[in-house]
């Protein structure tokens, strides 16, 4: 076995004993004074003469160099000097006649230790093994520790780390952006026999927009000195170059799938569970790939009609329902089940029309889940409904029904669903929904984040602290600050949403135009769903304010076009009116802390927000929709950050250099193709060794970026506040319908043990600038194996880092006979979960 092998050789067993702890005490070293050659080679202590060729050393680049024992003496001597002089500069570092600045006794120790190292190296060389530089350094470190000079050994370890840092590889493109694009968003092209490449995906999306606005492409956009067609061309080029991103749902579904179902354009939505139709509509939205926020506050759920008393199942008239093989069919099955408890019938479902598991979904892409996920969900929902007859539904029951519906989507639908449940702060059942051993009896509750509503003008600090302490202890429930209990948010809480309206004459006319069939009077309040429409600016590209403003205009242009897709007949006319009257945008910035000199400048942020608002107003006029009420936000950007090669949203890079790990099933075609080009970047995932591997990508933060270690929790929250004040608030164009409602800066705060109290005080005192805050206790990234993010710190980390040289993958050569895309793997609006892929 060669010295460079990683197996448990005698050399590595001995070298493992030299690992330094913080106080420089070696672990499991032989007794002080032991001649270490007797540990390594007990059969011989004598140096055996070998030829010069045999004693050549393997350098780091693989070349051979002459064996020079005096370099060993010098390296050990410099470590002694550093330990004795607390790291001071050594004026004699190159002067052997001055013993490298050491005393006679220390120099004698140096020669003795060097002799043992030389003997050991030459013994290995005599056996035909050519040692590497790192292996010789391991021996030096071990011999110093074995001689009892622990302070010198630590100095030598630090010296090695410093030299390794100077030699660390500079990786260019790591491959993560293209891998994520191909594995998570690329559509299968049957005509090409492969998945589309990123430029082809961008073209597909913008051809959809050109088709929709075909009659307007030559129209000059007021104030822009360009036609709409030219602005679309500019936007496509920016997306192709990854300077900006559209809605990632549009990248996933753009084309026929969105034209058939406009809900697929939108990342997320929010609604009140105040009408029996909301259950089936929520399922339809989840099946469309939309993240769903919902309110089960008491004032909303109480609007559901009470359930009549119910006879036993065998005494009820049976109603048969054959479930159509569409997302509308699945949602209708939910509606039939809930309504059967109002109508006094027992519904039996026929699943025979649902395609078999694995069948190709030609419009939306991916593969059919089969009928089992829906069947299981409906039976469990029936169990919840069986307990209700004779009274009104409780919020916890409405919540569980929706979570069981979400589990059907997660098990086999288009994508993993993302949900947030907002509830009344005094609802003890919802407060305690995830306490005790809830996962044993109510595992469906894992599919949501839960937050209590705190109206800013009414909430007390005691209420807030009760929730804050629950987050610290259990992780949930969270808190949600609002101006009005009828407002809400998407699952990541960066979009302010108001899914109800007060009817006026204009609204009533619109409702009639869109076919609203119910009687409604001026002054009535009715509810539906409000959607959020997101785009992203690549912060790393914003080297100057001017470039930032340019990308603001691009992102606002894309978002405004996306806001025109409002036909969702399954949700009804109320939802369409709600969405069209405010035509929301969510222009986000990904990688704010990559360019803090630009993107934390209040004046630059304000001008950028104004650019977004003005561009939206101009493009909206050109395409005939309302200008947006709210335009700017900051979303978590978990997956987008990987596509763009930036830190996520407003969050800092994990470190200057770190490993970013992405899980991949061994059956995934894209993963296997990537591995064939870059096997050195893949390894078995220890938690799922039978089925899953991980890819380790090397990530390096740009010069000038703010890193995780550079800021504490309060400094980070202050940055969130600054961006909210100067980017989000100026991006609020009007408050005509929903006073005080704002978009937000989605953020996750890492809190050290001594920071919790000050963080609570800061959030409470500045609650006008915060809506929801995710709180995570600080922990080390080496606390468990194969962490999603791991800083490069140790010499072995550097060796691994230097070995992660990426060979660019030509995905155009990846051939697939059929569509094996797995769009359910893509998560939108999933908060912290975005970091774990």
Question: What annotation goes with each model-predicted range?
Answer:
Residues 2-837:
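Extended catalytic cores of very large enzyme megasubunits
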């Amino acid at each position: 076995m060669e010295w460079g092998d990683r197996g448990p050789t005698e050399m590595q067993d001995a070298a493992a004993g030299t690992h330094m702890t913080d106080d420089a005490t070696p672990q499991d070293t032989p007794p002080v004074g032991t001649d270490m050659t007797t540990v390594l080679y007990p059969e011989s202590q004598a140096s055996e003469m070998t030829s010069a060729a045999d004693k050549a050393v393997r350098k780091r680049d693989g070349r051979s160099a002459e064996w020079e024992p005096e370099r060993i003496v010098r390296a050990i001597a410099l470590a002694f000097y550093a330990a004795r002089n607390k790291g001071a500069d050594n004026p004699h570092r190159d002067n052997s006649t001055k013993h490298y600045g050491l005393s006679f006794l220390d120099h004698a120790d140096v020669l003795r230790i060097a002799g043992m190292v030389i003997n050991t190296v030459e013994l290995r060389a005599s056996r035909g093994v050519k040692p590497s530089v790192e292996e010789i350094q391991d021996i030096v470190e071990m011999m110093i520790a074995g001689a009892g000079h622990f302070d010198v050994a630590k100095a030598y370890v630090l010296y090695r780390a410093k030299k390794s840092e100077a030699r660390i590889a500079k990786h260019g493109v790591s491959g993560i952006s293209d891998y994520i694009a191909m594995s998570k968003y690329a559509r299968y092209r049957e005509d090409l026999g492969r998945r589309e490449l990123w430029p082809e995906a961008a073209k597909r999306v913008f051809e959809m927009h050109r088709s929709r606005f075909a009659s307007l492409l030559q129209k000059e956009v007021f104030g822009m000195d360009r036609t709409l067609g030219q602005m679309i061309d500019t936007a496509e080029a920016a997306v192709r170059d990854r300077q900006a991103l559209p809605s990632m749902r549009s990248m996933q579904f753009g084309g026929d799938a969105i034209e058939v179902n406009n809900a697929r354009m939108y990342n997320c939505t929010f609604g009140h569970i105040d009408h029996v139709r909301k259950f089936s509509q929520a399922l339809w939205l989840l099946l469309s790939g939309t993240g769903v926020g919902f309110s089960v506050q008491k004032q909303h759920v109480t609007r559901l009609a009470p359930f009549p008393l119910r006879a036993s199942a065998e005494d009820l008239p049976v109603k048969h329902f054959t479930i159509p093989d569409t997302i509308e069919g699945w949602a209708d099955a939910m509606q039939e089940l809930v309504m059967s408890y109002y109508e006094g019938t027992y519904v039996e479902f026929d699943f025979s029309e649902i395609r078999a598991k694995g069948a190709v979904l030609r419009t939306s892409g991916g593969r059919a889940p089969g009928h089992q996920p829906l069947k299981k969900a409906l039976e469990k929902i029936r169990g919840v409904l069986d307990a209700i007859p004779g009274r009104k539904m409780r919020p916890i029951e409405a919540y569980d029904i929706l979570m069981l519906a979400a589990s059907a989507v997660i098990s086999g639908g288009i994508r993993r669903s993302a949900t947030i449940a907002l509830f009344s702060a005094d609802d003890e059942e919802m407060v305690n929904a995830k306490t005790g051993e809830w996962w044993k009896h109510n595992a469906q509750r894992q599919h949501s984040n839960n937050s209590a509503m705190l109206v800013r003008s009414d909430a007390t600090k005691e209420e807030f602290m009760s929730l804050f302490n629950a987050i610290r202890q259990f992780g949930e429930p969270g808190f949600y600050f609002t101006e009005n209990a009828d407002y809400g948010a998407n699952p990541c809480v960066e979009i302010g949403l108001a899914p109800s309206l007060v009817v006026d004459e204009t609204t009533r006319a619109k409702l009639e135009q869109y076919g609203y069939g119910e009687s409604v009077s001026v002054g009535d309040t009715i509810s539906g769903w409000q959607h959020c429409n997101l785009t992203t600016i690549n912060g790393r590209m914003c080297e100057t304010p001017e470039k930032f403003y340019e990308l603001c205009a691009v992102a606002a242009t894309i978002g405004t076009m996306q806001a025109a897709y409002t036909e969702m007949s399954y949700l009804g006319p109320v939802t369409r009116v709600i969405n069209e009257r405010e035509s929301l945008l969510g222009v986000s910035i990904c990688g704010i802390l990559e360019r803090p000199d630009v993107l934390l400048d209040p004046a630059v942020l304000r001008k950028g927000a104004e650019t977004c608002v003005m561009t939206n107003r101009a493009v909206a006029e050109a395409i005939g929709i309302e200008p947006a009420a709210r335009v700017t936000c900051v979303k978590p950007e978990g997956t987008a950050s990987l596509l763009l090669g930036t830190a996520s949203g407003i969050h800092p890079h994990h470190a200057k250099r770190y490993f970013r790990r992405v899980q991949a099933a061994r059956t995934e075609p894209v993963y296997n193709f990537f591995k064939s080009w870059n096997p050195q970047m893949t390894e078995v995932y220890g938690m799922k060794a039978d089925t899953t591997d991980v890819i380790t990508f090397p990530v390096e933060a740009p010069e000038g970026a703010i890193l995780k270690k550079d800021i504490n929790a309060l400094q980070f929250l202050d940055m969130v506040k600054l961006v909210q004040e100067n980017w989000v608030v100026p991006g609020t164009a009007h408050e005509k319908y929903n006073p005080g409602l704002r978009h937000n800066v989605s953020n996750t705060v890492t809190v050290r043990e001594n920071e919790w109290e000050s963080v609570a005080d800061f959030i409470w005192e500045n609650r006008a600038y915060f809506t929801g805050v995710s709180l995570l206790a600080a922990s080390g990234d080496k606390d468990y194996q194969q962490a999603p993010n791991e800083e490069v710190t140790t010499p072995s980390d550097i060796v691994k880092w230097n070995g992660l040289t990426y060979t660019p993958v030509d995905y155009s050569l990846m051939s697939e006979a059929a569509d094996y895309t797995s769009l359910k793997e893509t998560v939108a609006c999933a908060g912290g979960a975005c970091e774990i892929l």
